[in-house]
């Protein structure tokens, strides 16, 4: 039996809807025992503060700066994560001393890889004090110091999961995470590992629904299912410079914008943006060394029926199969949080978190800042 560490992963993604929490036991390599998971939604008021913080973050020139609302926001965000951990431990009947480490992502408020600048607010030392558990945080910065894009970081976890795929799933396999921004991880039959952001995920759909006063997202894709794709608008998105050339890069929330309010009706806009999110995945996958045979989809976007219908139809044209991560034996809601738990253990072991083929860094790079209570 390998030396297993119990780790909690905490993820607050680009959708800014709340905190995902996951527990696993792992050696930081191929032994993974997935345990419980949960989520905690942010209040509407706190979500509004996060969005206001994105505006203040535009002024950041040095990643240690916290202009405007950001310093207090960082403190309050960290305390919310501490509450989430305490509640989770109580629900699971666990004590802090039974957890070896927390992997703490924080909230990305600025990501400019071309300037080697990425900022995730979240005070790891405060979280360690509040929970009584060691914390590893700030896992993207070291990758950038070595010429990487600082994203995506989940591929190391995907590679471990790929070793335990259900029988019958044909490779090459691509893991797709559809959060606010989508990313993909290609696991070749020869073990090749390639990853990059693939385009907008739920982000544009969510913003479109909010613009029209119809909530924070399109539940189940119901609005999109009643609309039609506007091909001219979709074409405009898919001709974005992000998709051109073979050089892949990571994305920030500001790289794509929604259509003007009067440009499309609500349903057609939602359907068009769902199509764009799906087509972006296939368009980005065209840069891979071999055509994928299976797409394993996680993240909130897999619950949008219109997006999944579009993705399935596009993949089938290329002879590929699309499967919800839940139906492949994984937890599609908790996968990113699980990854952060796994990466925290890898960090403690000095193992790489990123690779030249996943972020463009100059060598395999570990990372993260460890702090004790």
From Swiss-Prot:
It catalyses: 1,6-anhydro-N-acetyl-beta-muramate + ATP + H2O = N-acetyl-D-muramate 6-phosphate + ADP + H(+). It comes from the Bacteria. GO terms for biological process: 1,6-anhydro-N-acetyl-beta-muramic acid catabolic process; amino sugar metabolic process; peptidoglycan turnover. Keywords: ATP-binding, Carbohydrate metabolism, Kinase, Nucleotide-binding, Transferase. InterPro entries: Anhydro_N_Ac-Mur_kinase, ATPase_NBD. Pfam families: AnmK. One of its GO terms (molecular function) is phosphotransferase activity, alcohol group as acceptor. Its EC number is 2.7.1.170. Pathway: Amino-sugar metabolism; 1,6-anhydro-N-acetylmuramate degradation; Cell wall biogenesis; peptidoglycan recycling. It is an enzyme of class 2 (transferase). ATP binds at residues 13-20. The keyword ATP-binding applies. Catalyzes the specific phosphorylation of 1,6-anhydro-N-acetylmuramic acid (anhMurNAc) with the simultaneous cleavage of the 1,6-anhydro ring, generating MurNAc-6-P. Is required for the utilization of anhMurNAc either imported from the medium or derived from its own cell wall murein, and thus plays a role in cell wall recycling. NCBIfam families: PRK09585.1-5. Belongs to the anhydro-N-acetylmuramic acid kinase family. This is Anhydro-N-acetylmuramic acid kinase. The gene is anmK.
């Amino acid at each position: 039996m390998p030396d297993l560490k119990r780790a909690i992963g905490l993820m607050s993604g680009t959708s800014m809807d709340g905190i995902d929490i996951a527990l696993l036991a792992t050696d930081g390599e191929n032994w993974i025992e997935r345990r419980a998971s949960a989520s905690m939604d942010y209040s509407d008021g706190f979500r509004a503060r996060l969005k206001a913080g994105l505006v203040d973050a535009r002024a950041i020139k040095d990643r240690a700066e916290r202009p405007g609302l950001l310093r207090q926001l960082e403190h309050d965000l960290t305390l919310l994560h501490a509450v989430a951990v305490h509640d989770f431990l109580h629900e699971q009947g666990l004590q802090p001393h039974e957890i070896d480490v927390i992997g703490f992502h924080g909230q990305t408020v600025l990501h400019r890889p071309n300037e080697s600048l990425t900022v995730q607010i979240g005070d790891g030392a405060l979280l360690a004090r509040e929970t009584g558990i060691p914390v590893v945080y700030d896992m993207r910065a070291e990758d950038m110091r070595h010429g990487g894009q600082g994203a995506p970081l989940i591929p190391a976890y995907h590679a471990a999961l790929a070793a335990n795929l259900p029988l019958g799933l044909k490779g090459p396999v691509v893991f797709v995470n559809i959060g606010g921004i989508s990313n993909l991880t290609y696991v070749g039959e020869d073990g090749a590992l390639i990853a990059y952001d693939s385009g907008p995920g739920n982000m544009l759909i969510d913003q479109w629904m909010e613009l029209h006063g119809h909530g924070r997202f399109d539940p189940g894709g119901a609005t999109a299912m009643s609309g039609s794709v506007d091909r001219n608008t979709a074409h405009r998105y898919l001709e974005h410079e992000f998709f051109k050339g073979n050089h892949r890069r990571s994305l920030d929330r500001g790289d794509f914008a929604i259509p003007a309010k009067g440009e499309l009706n609500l349903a057609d806009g939602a359907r068009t943006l769902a199509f764009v999110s799906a087509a972006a995945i296939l368009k980005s996958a065209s840069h891979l060394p071999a055509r994928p045979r299976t797409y394993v989809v996680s993240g909130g976007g897999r619950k949008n029926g219109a997006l999944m219908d579009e993705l399935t139809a596009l993949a089938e044209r290329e002879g590929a199969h699309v499967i919800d991560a839940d139906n492949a034996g994984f937890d599609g809601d908790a996968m990113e949080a699980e990854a952060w738990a796994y990466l925290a253990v890898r960090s403690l072991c000095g193992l790489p978190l990123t690779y030249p083929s996943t972020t463009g860094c100059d060598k395999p790079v570990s990372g993260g800042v460890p702090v004790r209570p």
